[in-house]
Amino acid sequence: MNFKSNLSVTIILVICSFVQSCSRYSPRLEAALSLAGENRVELEKVLEHYQRDRKKYKAACFLIENMVGRYTLTNQKLDSLDAEFFDAVGNLDIRFEDTEVNVYLVQIKVNEIWNRVLAKYGDPTKYHYGRSDDLRSVTADYLIDNIDEAFATLDYPWTSHLSFEDFCEYVLPYRYGSEPLTEDWRHYFRERYKWIADSLAGNTDPVAVCRLINQDISTWFLPAGGGHIFKNHPRSLSVDQLRKCRLSSCVEQAAVALFAMRSMGLAVAHCTIPHWGNRSAGHDFNAILTKDNEWADFSAAKFNPGENEIANKPPKVFVKKFSRKMMTEDELEVIKQFDFPYAGYQDVTSHLVKTSDVTVQIPDSLKDDVSVVYLCVFNNKRWVPVSYSYSRNGRARFVEMGRRIVYLPQYYKDGRFRPVGDPIFLEKDGSQHPAVADSANPVSRMVLTRKYGRFKYQLGYAGEMVGARFQGADNPEFENAVTLFTIDSLPDSKMDTFAIAPVKCRYVRYLYPDIFARGNAGNVAEIAFIGDDGKPLEGKYIGIKEANANNIRTVFDGNTRNYLRVYQSADSTAVFPGNVIVVDSPKPIWIGLDLGGDRNVTGVAYCPRNDSNNIYPHCTYELFCWDGGWKSLGQRAGQKDSLVYENVPSGCLYILRNRTEGKEERLFTYEDGKQVWW
């Protein structure tokens, strides 16, 4: 939804709420109806239809009042593109029993279809769009059907705990975003899940129903694979499009759960983390209102309530509500600075993660300028607001902020944000302290090895090499092979070399650990066998029969930025790229070299799949420290796999930028001779 247009209609509501009306409707309802134009007749049909049913009448009022600012983008070319794309994707044979392999296969096929329709219709992000406002287009029949179907779910025993307000917010809504409206989605899913009503007759636990539906969703919907495409799609996906596509980013996962579960009377919310506190971007997922009126988060087709993992550090977690807060004009002016629709969100951070309050002391020199303070997090490029507070007695208090995050308090003046004070570390235990640059006690020598932290998925790639063995033999079958080296600890993200006692052999190989038992893809970026001269040995590529020279070359090419994967797939028609070895059943996996004759092996080297955020010799880097703003500490050329800076101010935040290439960069501190990421 376009936030600015949403804001403008909210202002209209604010104004109208103070206008006395001689209408038979409430001021807010009249304000909405007055925006409906000729479609007012359709909306009033709904109100007249429910004149004798007080609850359904109130539900109709709730929907109409909160239609303001809700719409679908319109463009005939996009309709044609969507029809061709989703019909083609809907015809794909997608298997759901092995998610990782199938996501990979589906992505290849879907990307081909997407690129084909883009070539035909052009880039949809560059189309000119019209707008179909719900108030001016939704029919009486559509709303009446939606309301009646939603109320029918109140016969289920697991809805007995719901208040009318929660029912309206989390069961009744007919849409979740800007998607084209779909007829009969509630009926479709109620028919699909009518067996649940029989099997759980008398069960009052909504979480039990949620688990069953979520399990079913996992049989026809992949919880990944669509992010690259959908982030370039200008409007939300309809129910029909989601059912055809069957792959997703986290937003589409949340949408599928809303449609499927609300159709069965479950109070399910769309949760959002607009910005992570320790990396770029954000995240979307779901939560269900339990019979104890607590939120239990989950991820559609992936994690049930009680199993979901919030993998990064959220400063704020919000529930998207269908209703919107009534706000004063001053409040509306304040929230203009957020890049998400703050007025439609409810803060649930403390329900899902540990939080602490943060108090900001406003310097005397700024007290006359600062009436509102924004608490900001770093999104890898700039500081973005995630919360705000009014100044009272020279202080601003922020409640229930996520921990283990660096926050920068700022105020807005003359079109830009300005710092109120130093960044604030909110530690894991809730303790707080400022980040203050100390030039009087500098870090005498700072050694930097990365510009971005290693996240869980990166550590996962590294873990896939643990247990691997480097072996040598005098025969190509590796009978009586000698193990030269075993990886027994988590590898770093760069190329590491280890000396061994010299061993003479002709054939050498990298023997994977049992990746199939672990359920991973055995990602490897680079390996090497070191000779007497300290350089990697060369030879003819050898390996299991499923490997070929193109596969094997990937890990012997001296480039740590590409990588080799191993997949198990029985799909003999699948076409995999050259950096993938495909086997049809679990077996020992190995790749190696025929050295052409006996050679001394004096060491091994290896690097796991990584994100290319290491230090590289061909790149130029610039280090900055925060001291009232980012201050450059000079540029350096990469020296093998590290950079060295001397006499650097201590106690503050740093950021390292690659001036040659790349885009990811992250805040860090320097503690006990190491980079600590925030």
Question: Where are the language model's segments positioned?
Answer:
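Extracellular beta-sheet/turn segments enriched in Thr/Pro/Gly and aliphatic residues
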Residues: 339-351, 422-450, 674-678
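Disordered, acidic Ser/Thr/Pro-rich linker "stalks" and the adjacent N-terminal cap
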Residues: 438-494, 500-503, 518-603, 607-616, ...
